[in-house]
Curated annotation (Swiss-Prot):
<keyword id="KW-0732">Signal</keyword>
<feature type="signal peptide">
    <location>
        <begin position="1"/>
        <end position="27"/>
    </location>
</feature>
<keyword id="KW-0964">Secreted</keyword>
<dbReference type="GO" id="GO:0007218">
    <property type="term" value="P:neuropeptide signaling pathway"/>
</dbReference>
<feature type="propeptide">
    <location>
        <begin position="58"/>
        <end position="164"/>
    </location>
</feature>
<feature type="modified residue" description="Methionine amide">
    <location>
        <position position="54"/>
    </location>
</feature>
<dbReference type="GO" id="GO:1900738">
    <property type="term" value="P:positive regulation of phospholipase C-activating G protein-coupled receptor signaling pathway"/>
</dbReference>
<dbReference type="GO" id="GO:0005184">
    <property type="term" value="F:neuropeptide hormone activity"/>
</dbReference>
<dbReference type="GO" id="GO:0090277">
    <property type="term" value="P:positive regulation of peptide hormone secretion"/>
</dbReference>
<comment type="similarity">
    <text>Belongs to the bombesin/neuromedin-B/ranatensin family.</text>
</comment>
<dbReference type="GO" id="GO:0005615">
    <property type="term" value="C:extracellular space"/>
</dbReference>
<protein>
    <recommendedName>
        <fullName>Gastrin-releasing peptide</fullName>
    </recommendedName>
</protein>
<dbReference type="InterPro" id="IPR000874">
    <property type="entry name" value="Bombesin"/>
</dbReference>
<dbReference type="Pfam" id="PF02044">
    <property type="entry name" value="Bombesin"/>
</dbReference>
<comment type="function">
    <text>Stimulates the release of gastrin and other gastrointestinal hormones. Stimulates pancreatic protein and fluid secretion, and increases acid secretion from the avian proventriculus.</text>
</comment>
<keyword id="KW-0027">Amidation</keyword>
<dbReference type="GO" id="GO:0034774">
    <property type="term" value="C:secretory granule lumen"/>
</dbReference>
Length: 164
């Protein structure tokens, strides 16, 4: 049977015992009191509260945040009214700017391609892909500015409901 030498009868149980001890000894070392070292298991401390404060914002910037619920979150101070007016003016200016840009692009596209000035074309009727990209980009910018403005105004008017 070609075993290479005589087998000892206790070799297999000895190897099994050695494998069992090696697998059991790979755990975290014990502290002098007998409990495992938590710094080895959790290097940054306990993880029981992970995610508890995720997404929460500080309310220190807003007056009357947690005092009484019948008070408005922002007072009608001249600073707040001025800030809201500034937001409204920026939105109006950006809308006018985008309308001017779209008007200039449409006029240059009509006259350069021999189109009639009274003929209005939709964005899917353009001849090349670059004009379509320009139209869609200006619409995306307009939508982005509108969403940004609306979210800022909503957050300024009611910051507690905007978070949920």
């Amino acid at each position: 049977m070609g075993g290479g030498g005589p087998r000892r009868p206790g070799t297999l149980p000895l190897l099994a015992l050695l494998a069992l001890l090696a697998a059991h000894g790979g755990a975290a070392p014990l502290q002098p009191g007998g409990s495992p070292a938590l710094t080895k298991i959790y290097p940054r401390g306990s993880h029981w509260a992970v995610g508890h404060l995720m997404g929460k914002k500080s309310t220190g910037d807003f007056p009357y945040a947690y005092e009484e619920e019948n008070k408005i979150p922002l007072s009608a101070s001249p600073e707040n009214i001025k800030q809201l007016d500034d937001y409204l003016q920026r939105e109006e200016m950006s809308k006018h700017l985008l309308q001017l840009l779209e008007g200039n692009e449409n006029k240059s596209a009509h006259f350069s391609k021999g189109g009639l000035p009274w003929h209005t074309r939709n964005s899917w009727e353009t001849d090349d892909s670059s004009s379509w990209k320009d139209v869609s980009r200006t619409r995306c910018v307009s939508a982005f500015l509108t969403v940004t403005f609306c979210s800022k105004v909503a957050y300024q008017l009611c910051p507690t409901s905007a978070l949920s």
